[in-house]
């Protein structure tokens, strides 16, 4: 069965002019009548391509400052009329509505306008009305009409022209892409309006992203995966990859965890992550010192890990990092000599983001569950010294206060149950993801070994019993930070006082699952 549709008439109205002239020339060479509007018509005409202005074609002038251009029956009837129904064809002939076989439209740059921080009125003016209406009409009638919504689709369309027209399979693919685009566009508008009105969780919440990369596989080789970009928060989605192999699903997940963690700190910091959990976090006078101290926490787990820094990467730090095998280094920027040095490690992926994510920036996080998804605000909670409540007879020293705040900030990024030992601005032991808090405490102490005595300890949630605290005391901890709130808080406080250690409550929990 020959399901090719020969293109005789096309409507082009694009805000993104990339590839427009090449598409226009191919259509003109194939004898296609080109209808167009505004800037698209002007660009085609300047390239010597004959076009018919939509206003001349329909007899209806553009109006309302260009808000109404194509919202007329002659255009929508030409897109929606079914060529296989005699009654449709008769009505089209009676009302002088010729069929339109190809639509090329991309939408006003609403997402880009919002990302630039434009004012409310400018954002509203960049909400496209006619474009989505055209796209949906053409996609609905894909049996007869091909719809292009991206310059990336032009080459295949040009090839189809040479082959005698578009196939049904091609038109269906284009229709699917068209509806995905309008859905994403409407989702962006809906999310922006919800933000403007302060409605974090509207009755209908749409998720939309632009596919940035097809991945080799997902978390495991038998799973398929892709990476979608949803915004401009600095991180792996915005990064330039200077070298190394293609990022994997696990690389992206782990790199995001590392970069979000390292952004928590004002001083030069290094975070090493393995399986989305930090295995070493440290501050330093510079990145080289921070690296040495972060690596010292757990050098075995650091092998094959992800490295994140919160300063432009210098050559001294890069040289140290190059001494072990790592999957990814992510940084806001890097010095040319550091880039040159790391280029010797061909498999190492080097990502430069141009900035750091703001830990306090509001936003939503999602997680899929069977039959739906959970939405919650991002964990943007940050505790300062003034937020701490000393609950023991002994108060922490100034040095302990600094380490307690550092350790609790790390705990926010470790899978629950999380126990963090730290000393002088560096982790000395990390216990992650255990079903009981006492086990996390013991594992962290075991991994830290002789580094643990003199450390402070942070817990991402309250100690339900004194046993987890006792394990930390036995390991040599001198001060504790935890949210508090257990019905056995008094029992835990008594254990701390009996051991002569200091303990503070934050009133804020940092579960992470």
UniProtKB/Swiss-Prot annotation:
One of its GO terms (molecular function) is IMP cyclohydrolase activity. Residues 1-149 form the MGS-like domain. It comes from the Bacteria. GO terms for cellular component: cytosol. SMART domains: AICARFT_IMPCHas, MGS. GO terms for biological process: 'de novo' IMP biosynthetic process. Its EC number is 2.1.2.3, 3.5.4.10. Pathway: Purine metabolism; IMP biosynthesis via de novo pathway; 5-formamido-1-(5-phospho-D-ribosyl)imidazole-4-carboxamide from 5-amino-1-(5-phospho-D-ribosyl)imidazole-4-carboxamide (10-formyl THF route): step 1/1; Purine metabolism; IMP biosynthesis via de novo pathway; IMP from 5-formamido-1-(5-phospho-D-ribosyl)imidazole-4-carboxamide: step 1/1. InterPro entries: AICAR_Tfase_dup_dom_sf, Cytidine_deaminase-like, MGS-like_dom, MGS-like_dom_sf, PurH-like. Keywords: Hydrolase, Multifunctional enzyme, Purine biosynthesis, Transferase. It catalyses: (6R)-10-formyltetrahydrofolate + 5-amino-1-(5-phospho-beta-D-ribosyl)imidazole-4-carboxamide = 5-formamido-1-(5-phospho-D-ribosyl)imidazole-4-carboxamide + (6S)-5,6,7,8-tetrahydrofolate; IMP + H2O = 5-formamido-1-(5-phospho-D-ribosyl)imidazole-4-carboxamide. NCBIfam families: PRK00881.1 (NF002049), purH (TIGR00355). Belongs to the PurH family. HAMAP family: PurH (MF_00139). The IMP cyclohydrolase activity resides in the N-terminal region. This is Bifunctional purine biosynthesis protein PurH. It comes from Acidiphilium cryptum (strain JF-5).
